[in-house]
Amino acid sequence: MLVDYQNVNIYQGEELILRDVCWTVEEGQFVYVIGKVGSGKSSLLKTLYCELDMYSDEANKAEVLDKNLLAIKRKDIPALRRQMGIIFQDFQLLHDRNVYRNLYFVLKSTGWKNSGDIDNRINEVLQQVGMEDKKDKRPHELSGGEQQRIAIARALLNKPKMIVADEPTGNLDPETADNIVSLLHHITETGTAVIMSTHNLPMVDKYPGTVYKCDKGELQLTRTNKNA
């Protein structure tokens, strides 16, 4: 079990956003989190990588990648985040360097030392997302879809057990968005779970997954797909 939440209350500041959340995610699962703007999708995802705190008196259990989030120490959060890949709607690439150096920076800052291993891993992830011919380009020279593919490559660098994608297609045209979700769906075949928030319901129908909906302060399981 990669995620195991039992009766968790989730707050944004002092405001209760989601109450009594029960949620599990398993290896290789594709999970959608849907709901209106402001319904709690992003808040839920932020708890996974400790961007939002959770409280022991407001939950029975909150575990991610075998770490107890109700008792995790600040110094242990970076190690937890290294076991997951995080993808944002606005890409968050470093614009002062090319694609290769963007990925190089991540590997060096997460403890990789051997230059040959670094080079091999960068080439592997760029090939995985179909961007191996773009490694010398700077972000501003790429389309939105290409930048998001690079962001996915970055998320894959440390061979994460799960990927957390917060509205990864929100700034993309429909065809490009389709290609990005197809790529994320394909990634689950390697055993990596993908948790993706979206309000693109046609995409949810096209690429099957387990669907949770944030609605009226609750997280509701609305569709189960055993192969997702």
Language-model-detected regions and their locations in the chain:
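Helix N-cap at the start of a conserved alpha-helix in ABC-type nucleotide-binding domains
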Residues: P174-T176
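Short coil-to-helix segment of the ABC ATPase nucleotide-binding domain corresponding to the Q-loop/switch region
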Residues: R97-F105
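Catalytic Walker B motif of ABC-type/P-loop ATPase nucleotide-binding domains
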Residues: I163-D166
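Conserved ABC ATPase signature
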Residues: R138-L142, E146-Q148
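Helix-to-loop junction immediately C-terminal to a conserved catalytic motif
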Residues: Y49
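ABC ATPase NBD coupling module
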Residues: L69-G85, E189
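Conserved signature/switch motifs of ABC ATPase nucleotide-binding domains
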Residues: K137-H140, N158, T190
